[in-house]
Amino acid sequence: MLVHVGQKKPGAMRLAKTRMRELEALAETAGVEVVERIIQLRDRVDPKYVLGKGKLESVLIKAIDLDVETMIFDQNLNPTQASTIASRTDLAVIDRTQLILDIFAQRAESKDGKLQVELAQLKYSLPRLGAKDDALSRLTGGIGGRGPGETKLEVGRRRAQERLNRLERQLKEQTKQRAQRRRRRTSDDVPVVAIVGYTNAGKSTLLNALTNAGVLAENKLFATLDTRSRRLSLPQGNNIILS
């Protein structure tokens, strides 16, 4: 179930429908089956329930009728909102950022990319630990037992923080190695040219057409996450590195 909540103002419904179409495309890319779409425009977004308590109850009834397992909010939720909605609905509750990070986790192929995605997921999700025990298990890979005097939640937070610290150390080392490779490329006096564009704009398709790179190119949002670099010979005889 997709949910968009916005303020009443001129053009708000048109914007909501546009964002909802993109959110649905993101959900489909993540492998989620969308069975319902909810748009609510309010005088102000409810600071606790986002939708408003009454509207949330009616949405929950619809979710039960449709056998919904997950609510995906178009806007980012703060930890209190995510926890409150999950507790009242007993559904998995995620927001746009978490959905995009999930897609990144599916698409990342390089070691560097996987580390960056996991670090981003931990940083975003750590403040949200505690809404549900299963959310804690998903984040930390399962919690076996308790530390002395610690609750399951405290153990989960501690282990998540430890993992986050390890990832930051690994990424620091990866950054050093990447800088060394970049210095080697620039020492060859070969210009590096970047292809820049919005997701699904055709960057990978263009790279393949110019260099026969063989990079995955699909009509999906964030189909390719990792950067690929290939040497390209120009008609004048010069070479460039195209990324």
Protein language model regions, located:
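Flexible beta-alpha connector loops of hexameric P-loop NTPases
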Residues: K9-L15, V45-Y49, R107-D112, K152, ...
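Short, acidic Gly/Pro/Ser/Thr-rich loop/turn segments
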Residues: P10, L129, G202
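Short alpha-helix plus adjacent loop in nuclease-associated cores
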Residues: Q98-L119
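Short acidic/polar capping segments at secondary-structure boundaries
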Residues: Q98-L99, P127, R159
